Amino acid sequence: MEIGGSGAPPPLLLLPLLLLLGTGLLPASSHIETRAHAEERLLKRLFSGYNKWSRPVANISDVVLVRFGLSIAQLIDVDEKNQMMTTNVWVKQEWHDYKLRWDPGDYENVTSIRIPSELIWRPDIVLYNNADGDFAVTHLTKAHLFYDGRVQWTPPAIYKSSCSIDVTFFPFDQQNCTMKFGSWTYDKAKIDLVSMHSRVDQLDFWESGEWVIVDAVGTYNTRKYECCAEIYPDITYAFIIRRLPLFYTINLIIPCLLISCLTVLVFYLPSECGEKVTLCISVLLSLTVFLLLITEIIPSTSLVIPLIGEYLLFTMIFVTLSIVITVFVLNVHHRSPRTHTMPAWVRRVFLDIVPRLLFMKRPSVVKDNCRRLIESMHKMANAPRFWPEPESEPGILGDICNQGLSPAPTFCNRMDTAVETQPTCRSPSHKVPDLKTSEVEKASPCPSPGSCHPPNSSGAPVLIKARSLSVQHVPSSQEAAEGSIRCRSRSIQYCVSQDGAASLTESKPTGSPASLKTRPSQLPVSDQTSPCKCTCKEPSPVSPITVLKAGGTKAPPQHLPLSPALTRAVEGVQYIADHLKAEDTDFSVKEDWKYVAMVIDRIFLWMFIIVCLLGTVGLFLPPWLAGMI
């Protein structure tokens, strides 16, 4: 552009403006140029002839004092398997270099400058217990140089230091990891270390989610190594770190405790349900799957067994032992007299002594088939009882049941019409009649075989006793033609007076039901108003009746012949009674074995509860005593 061309201001107007700008900007620009020129001149003067390989001392005998400090920024990881601790730290170093001094007045009051650390001498301080990576600082940051020769250098570094990790109380463990810093080539006569602070600086520490630093103390040490005759100094920082157990408590400890509790419940489950072994195996499978999931969580080290590993092993043995004991208890529960005989000491210990110690009460389960059969017969007969009162005829029912017998019920057909007054039946031959085994009609029980009330002379009923005697009278052809005998059943119900009953109840039955015996003189005679079903025209001097079992101990018994049908019936009743008695005995012994199994279950229930509690206390007590909880 041409000066003075069209559109340009006149030169006379620009001249004052340029003068004003020049007077205002000239001092600042000259000052900036002067300071930059001063630093440039300073750097040229400091590094002209500077050798970074020689120690910064005036005399060869002087010692370079290096002030050393450590500031931790983050605890990255603690590897229990590889025994390493990874940290992010700032390595603070400070020393004096007499060759790097100047007078600030000569250089526009420049008191400090930042220079590349590669240009100056640096102490070769390394991490002695480095496990992986570089021993020294890899990122060479700039150093801060002061006019008096003091050099400050704080490079960042990520170290993987070796750490002897003790996982005995895992996850309630506390580790002591060290970081040892010192010069690798210079001994104490050349370089000596001085600690800046007694503790590690944690002002810029980023909190970890798994570990917390309890304390970090630095100590100064000197050591003479076998390789060299010189003494080498070092500063060792001890990091006391504690694991935060919340994650392991929720995901590791609580499930183990719950599995142990499930194992205890196995012994509280009744043996009758049949699910004890199923529950044991389910608990074992769940524990196995759980162990597969936590393999990566537990420190895989062979130096020591972690406490949680011991507890898991304890739980595994706990569950396995519960399966073995459950199988044994079920074997005891299903024992019977046919397979095992209960020893006397087992009965004494597990049925008498141990239940009292455990405050156990045996369930009242009683099975008496003999008496149940009698009761069912009473219900079928719709009668108060078949047998006399205990006080008037003691021991009849009890003796029958105790001997393994079951009294056969007697039934009789009631006539549709009222029974008229007729003479008693008399056999033409005055002998015991034959018993017929065919053409047996259905029988219905007497309405009240237990007691009959025939009217006396005054019309008032008199209490008499009842006897049911199984007979079958075969009438002769003449009697059948006359139609005087009307017997419809094998069983005839006789009602005798109290005097007659007393004579019959003086003695207890002593013989077998197969041999039915009585005295003919003691047989009751049918009353005219008897409710029984056989009515005759004429009385008989000797009653032709065959009784099941009657007679006393005073008079000699007389045996009467029985029909084959009655004999088979008595044998069947005896067989049923023997079978029911044996079944009652077997049932009683089986109940004893079941109760023994219940007692064993209760013993192991309390044992496993105590062991589970002791195992839980053993898991938490040692770390608590060590001050880690």
UniProtKB/Swiss-Prot annotation:
Q: Which residues lie on this side of the membrane: Cytoplasmic?
A: 333-603
**Which segments does the entry list as coiled coil?**
none
The chemistry this enzyme catalyses reads: K(+)(in) = K(+)(out); Na(+)(in) = Na(+)(out); Ca(2+)(in) = Ca(2+)(out)
User: Which stretches does UniProt call biased (Polar residues)?
Assistant: 504-529
Query: By its UniProt entry, which Gene3D superfamilies does this protein fall under?
Result: Neurotransmitter-gated ion-channel ligand-binding domain, Neurotransmitter-gated ion-channel transmembrane domain
Function in brief: Component of neuronal acetylcholine receptors (nAChRs) that function as pentameric, ligand-gated cation channels with high calcium permeability among other activities. nAChRs are excitatory neurotrasnmitter receptors formed by a collection of nAChR subunits known to mediate synaptic transmission in the nervous system and the neuromuscular junction. Each nAchR subunit confers differential attributes to channel properties, including activation, deactivation and desensitization kinetics, pH sensitivity, cation permeability, and binding to allosteric modulators.
What protein am I looking at? Neuronal acetylcholine receptor subunit alpha-4
Q: Which organism is it from?
A: Mus musculus
Top-level taxonomy: Eukaryota, Metazoa, Chordata, Craniata, Vertebrata
